[in-house]
Amino acid sequence: MVLTLVIAPLLFVALAGVLQLGALRVAVARVRAAADLATLVAVNDQDDAELAKSGSLRLSADAADVAREYFARELELSSSLLDGGAETIAAAADVAAYLSAPAYDTRTGARYERPTVRIAALVPVRTPVFGALVLRPVTTVEVLSVSSPR
């Protein structure tokens, strides 16, 4: 009986921690999918005049704005998981559009051989069980998404 009273709380804490880790993995997957979709939409927003004239793929001049807008839209779908507004998180994200290639990304050091859109963001995700377990109630997730036309 004494052993049960001692071990039961430990098992409960372990179970709660495991469940919070699983929820965190789901939240991270949703945030990464939001960034991936935003860069994909921005890359697919091609300069139609250049495409008709030369047949080459060139990003639209507002590709960075499109990526930021769609990132905010997609984060809004996961707003219950976030510790902050989707618009605020998207506004703070580092969104870069490299309209011509080759280009060098000063943040990552990568060299892009095609026109590219990149989103790098720090997204705060709620982890209330960790907060109850004397850990952080908010976990910041770093997201990096890069897309280019093929």
Could you describe each region identified by the protein language model?
Residues F12, A27, V31, A96-T106, ...:
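Structured catalytic/translocation cores of nucleotide/phosphate-coupled proteins
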